[in-house]
C-alpha cells in the first residue's frame, strides 16, 4: 500500500483507504472516480472535523452516494479515540462542552494536562521551555488576524500587561519544515486551522478569541464572524447559503480541531473572561 493524492490513485487497486475523508469537497465525482480504480474504499472521517461549508465528506453524504449507486456499505464507529494520545475521555468531554452545551462540571478522567494562562507572554515562555526540553510544541490560533503570508511580519498582535504579544503566522511555503521544526523560530510562527488538521504534537498553546464566546444568559455559544479574517471561509458561507446552525457547527469544529492537537498538555489563553470561566468550570482545570 502506498500513499497518493485522491486524483493520483493508480487504477487496478483492490482497496483504497481515504484518510481525512471529511475534507472531500466534490464527493460525487471523487468517489465515482475512485470506484473506477478500486473494488473497495474505506473512508476515515469525522463529521466534527469539517471546517468549511464546501467540505462534503459526512457520514450521511457517503451513505447517500452508496445507496444511489447500489453499493453495499458498512458504518463502523471507532471504539477509542487515538487523537490526543488515546485520551478519548478528553475528546468526549470537549464534545459535551461544545456540542451539548454542557453547563455543569464534568468528572474529567483524562491524563492530558489542561492549563489556563493569564498572560500570553508567560505562556510563550513556558512553551519555549518545553521545546528546549525536547518536546514537540506549537502555537495555534483561530483565523482572526490578517495573513500577510510573510514570516517576517508580526500579523498577530495582542496587548498584554507585560507588553504586546507579537507573532507571525506559520509559513505559506515550507510548512513541513515548520511542522517538524523544534527551534525557537518555529514557536514564533503560529499555526492556523489549515495547518492543524491531521497533525499532533506533544504540547500546544491555543489562543481562544472572540469569534467563539459563551453567553451565560442564553446558555449557548455566540459566533461573531466579524472577528474572522479568513475571507475565503466567510465568502464560502455566503456562496453556500450556510444556515446559522451550520455556521455554528463549523466554528465549533474549528476549535475542536485546534484543542485536540496535543498528546501531553494543552495551554489556553482566553480573550473573553466569561468563556474562560465556563470552559474551566466544565472541564475542571
Where are these regions (language model features)?
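Structural motif
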Residues: 15-19, 42, 140, 205-207
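Short, aromatic/basic amphipathic alpha-helical patches
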Residues: 58-67, 153-160, 277-285
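C-terminal accessory regions
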Residues: 42, 186-285
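Flexible, charged surface loops at secondary-structure boundaries
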Residues: 8-12, 35-36, 129-136, 260
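Conserved helicase/translocase motor-coupling segment
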Residues: 52-57, 69-93, 99-221, 248
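Signature of the SF2 helicase/ATPase Hel1-core->accessory helical subdomain module
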Residues: 18-78
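Conserved RecA-like ASCE ATPase "motif II neighborhood" in helicase/translocase motors
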Residues: 1-37, 188-192, 254
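Short, basic, glycine/proline-bearing loop/turn elements
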Residues: 13-19, 172-181, 230-242
Amino acid at each position: 500500500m502506498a500513499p497518493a493524492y485522491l486524483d493520483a490513485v493508480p487504477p487496478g487497486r483492490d482497496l483504497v483507504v481515504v484518510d481525512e475523508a471529511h475534507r472531500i469537497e466534490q464527493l460525487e465525482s471523487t468517489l465515482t472516480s475512485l470506484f473506477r480504480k478500486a473494488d473497495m474504499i474505506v473512508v476515515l472521517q469525522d463529521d466534527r472535523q469539517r471546517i468549511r461549508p464546501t467540505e462534503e465528506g459526512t457520514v450521511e453524504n457517503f451513505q447517500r452516494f452508496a445507496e444511489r449507486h447500489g453499493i453495499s456499505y458498512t458504518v463502523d464507529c471507532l471504539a477509542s479515540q487515538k487523537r490526543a494520545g488515546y485520551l478519548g475521555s478528553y475528546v468526549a468531554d470537549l464534545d459535551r462542552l461544545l456540542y451539548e452545551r454542557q453547563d455543569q462540571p464534568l468528572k474529567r478522567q483524562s491524563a492530558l494536562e489542561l492549563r489556563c494562562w493569564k498572560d500570553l507572554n508567560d505562556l510563550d515562555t513556558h512553551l519555549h521551555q518545553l521545546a528546549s526540553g525536547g518536546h514537540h510544541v506549537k502555537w495555534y490560533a483561530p483565523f482572526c488576524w490578517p495573513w500577510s503570508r510573510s514570516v517576517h511580519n508580526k500579523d498577530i498582535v495582542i496587548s498584554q500587561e507585560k507588553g504586546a504579544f507579537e507573532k507571525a503566522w506559520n509559513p505559506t511555503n515550507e510548512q513541513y519544515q515548520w511542522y517538524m521544526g523544534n527551534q525557537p523560530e518555529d514557536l514564533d510562527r503560529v499555526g492556523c486551522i489549515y495547518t492543524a488538521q491531521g497533525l499532533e504534537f506533544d504540547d500546544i498553546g491555543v489562543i481562544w478569541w472572540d469569534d467563539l464566546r459563551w453567553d451565560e444568559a442564553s446558555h449557548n455559544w455566540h459566533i461573531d464572524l466579524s472577528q474572522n479574517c479568513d475571507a475565503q471561509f466567510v465568502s464560502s458561507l455566503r456562496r453556500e447559503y450556510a444556515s446559522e446552525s451550520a455556521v455554528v457547527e463549523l466554528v465549533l469544529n474549528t476549535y475542536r480541531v485546534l484543542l485536540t492537537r496535543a498528546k501531553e498538555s494543552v495551554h489556553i489563553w482566553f480573550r473573553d473572561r466569561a468563556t474562560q470561566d465556563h470552559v474551566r468550570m466544565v472541564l475542571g482545570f
